[in-house]
Amino acid sequence: MKFSSANKILFSGLVASANAYDLLKDYAGDLKIGVAANAMRFSNSNYVNAMKAFNMMVAENDCKLSGIQQQKGVYNFNGCDNHYNKAKELGMEFRGHCLIWHSYQPSWFQNADANTLKNAIVDHITKTLQHYEGKIKVWDVVNEAIDDNSNGNGWNMRRSFLYNKVPNFVDLAFQTARKVSPNTKLFYNDYNAEGVYAKAESIYNFVSDLKKRNIPIDGVGLQYHVGAKEQPSYNKINDLIGRYCKLGLEVHITELDVKLQGDQNGQSQAFSNALKACLANSCCKAFLVWGVGDNDSWLGANEQALLFNGSYQPKPVYNTLLNILKTSARPASSSAKTLPGNSKSKTLPGVNSKTLPGNKSKTLPGASKTLPGNKSKTLPGGNSNTLPGNKSKTLPGGNSKTLPGNKSRTLPGGNSKTLPGGKSRTLPGGNSKTLPGGKSKTLPGGNSKTLPGGKSKTLPGGNSKTLPGGSSKTLPGGKSKTLPGGNSKTLPGGSSKTLPGGKSKTLPGGSSKTLPGGKSKTLPGGNSKTLPGGNSKTLPGGSSKTLPGGKSKTLPGGNSKTLPGGSSKTLPGGKSKTLPGGNSKTLPGGNSKTLPGGKSKTLPGGNSKTLPGGSSKTLPGGKSKTLPGGSSKTLPGGKSKTLPGGNSKTLPGGNSKTLPGGSSKTLPGGKSKTLPGGSSKTLPGGKSKTLPGGNSKTLPGGKSKTLPGGNSKTLPGGKSKTLPGGNSKTLPGGKSKTLPGGNSKTLPGGSSKTLPGGKSKTLPGGNSKTLPGGKSKTLPGGNTKTLPGGACKPTTVTVTQKVTVTVTVESQPTQGGMNQGGGNCAAKWGQCGGNGFNGPTCCQNGSRCQFVNEWYSQCL
């Protein structure tokens, strides 16, 4: 039965009256709006009717390993198949949940030895994905692998039997799934991921790391179990989803429920914020609630956490979500929605089309708005606004606005505005504005503005007012011809402004400004600025500024005021020749300024002040040579050599050598050598060597060596060595060594602060604090505090798998319960019991351990 083109559900009781409601799926647009189902309730017609409001289904339990393989090697897909078949019967897409999880597992799986467990993970993923190949498009591959006590600084892995026996089980699971089913979307799914707790940031860090290491992950599932009085703000969840989008990941809200907690407005706000944030981010493709009616919720009926009541009738919060979808849903990718009246609308994927009565609108991807009596056809990416009586055709990327009586045709990327009586045709990427009586033709990428009686022809190119790629402004009687190129006012790529009597010819990519009587020829190139009496030779991409008597030589690379890619401004009598390059006022792409009597020659390159990638400023008597990527500033009498990417500043009498990416500042008498990425500051008498990525600051008499990514600060007499990713702070007499890893003050992933005489070594993920004289070692994710005199012996653990991983550590952290509310108790929503569970059985303050089933108890 249909009402106003939308499906409605009728509930009939013992009385004649009936309640009808619109279905969420009919207004969801391109969003999958789903529900978790339990096959045991499929015989209840009211339950099934309520499910018809959704267009996606996920099974609560029957598609988990425990529902498919209760006995080792014996696969029974009947339960999962029942859910899948019901979804197909109701026209719903089916979402797979979940392949690997530490909880709710049969004893044979949980108690297996490391090698058996590894093989079982591979076998289960392989056989399950093969069974549903071409049927289930999305699977949660790994569920809830991050520890509840993760504080947002890096992440801590949950110390489950999976991690303890197969530490790389997450990588193994995703790699196996991709190999078996290349076209299936692979998700990581977790709770407390929506931003209420710090764990959400740790989950983001963990997923980001998977992406950086090229682990084949396609999306992240935010479970979103919250309460009316404990929920993320809209800005928080919107920002979080947006950051996942920037990682190139798809986002699903997978298990949404909101405990009422006596606050109906708060519950409505939590549901609303989640849906609005999902709709606001194009990568958020699915929005699922965890259960149909309140009686079905794993939280219990008293929490009233779902969209339907115990009789499977929609609650007010259902209508709240429905109204949001009706007003804010993104358009469906392959369907069209037509408003009542005489309108016709055909919309291709990704297109927004709004047509008022009496109009016709056909829109390819893009946006089209047509007022009564008008016709508008917009190809992909184009925006068209047409007033009555006009016709407008816009190809992809073009914007066209036409006033009465005019005609405007815009090809892709072009913008065209035509006043009465004027004609304007713009090819792709060009912008054209024509006043009455003027004619303007713009080729792609160009911008053209012509005053009455003037003529302007623009060839293809960069950003230009006259010709494509170039910018040209011509006064009456002036002529301007521009060739294709970079950023220019006159010719493509170049910029030229010519006053009467002046001549200016600019080749592509350069910018030239010439005063009357002056001549300027600019070849494409860099940036050059030379003061009188100075000699400057700049190679491509470099920048050089030389005061009288100074010399500067720049190799190819970064930003340069002198060589190609620069700009040249020449006063009468001055000459400037610039070879091809980057952005420039004089030569294409470069910037060059030459005062009378000065000469400047610039070779092709990028944008640099001294040499490619480097910056050099030299006062009289100083010499400076900079290799690409580095920046060097030398005062009189000082010498400075910088390799690519390094920053070096040397005061008189100091020597400084900086490799790419490093920064070095040396005071008189000090020596400093910095490798790429590191930063080093050395006071008199101190020595500092920094490898790539590290930051090192050393006071007099101290020594500091920092490997990539590490930060080290050493006071006099202290020594500090930091490997990549770690942060180390050592007071006088202390020693600190940091291995690579996560976020840590001492070693990557760990945090270490050492007072004088103390030693601390931390492996990734661990947190360690050591007082003077004490020794402490921490494995990833563990927390340990050692008082003076304590020590641990190093232990070597070797795990042999498809790839052999060897980890050397100094101690093994412990995990276990503490008194009620303690830091090692399970966090809210965490597991606190169940058959075979060996984790903490107490809950942190504000929650209690509640029995869910024989396999699972949770802190609520």
From Swiss-Prot:
GO terms for molecular function: cellulose binding; endo-1,4-beta-xylanase activity. InterPro entries: CBD_sf, Cellulose-bd_dom_fun, GH10, GH10_AS, GH10_dom, Glycoside_hydrolase_SF. It catalyses: Endohydrolysis of (1->4)-beta-D-xylosidic linkages in xylans. Its main location: secreted. Pathway: Glycan degradation; xylan degradation. Transmembrane segments: none annotated. It is an enzyme of class 3 (hydrolase). Glycans are attached at residues 295, 309, 359, 374, 390, 406, 845. Sequence repeats lie at residues 375-382, 391-398, 415-422, 431-438, 439-446, 447-454, 455-462, 463-470, 471-478, 479-486, 487-494, 495-502, 503-510, 511-518, 519-526, 527-534, 535-542, 543-550, 551-558, 559-566, 567-574, 575-582, 583-590, 591-598, 599-606, 607-614, 615-622, 623-630, 631-638, 639-646, 647-654, 655-662, 663-670, 671-678, 679-686, 687-694, 695-702, 703-710, 711-718, 719-726, 727-734, 735-742, 743-750, 751-758, 759-766, 767-774, 775-782. SMART domains: fCBD, Glyco_10. The active site is at 144 (proton donor), 255 (nucleophile). Disulfide bonds join 278-284. Residues 21-324 form the GH10 domain. It comes from the Eukaryota. Belongs to the glycosyl hydrolase 10 (cellulase F) family. This is Endo-1,4-beta-xylanase B. It comes from Neocallimastix patriciarum.
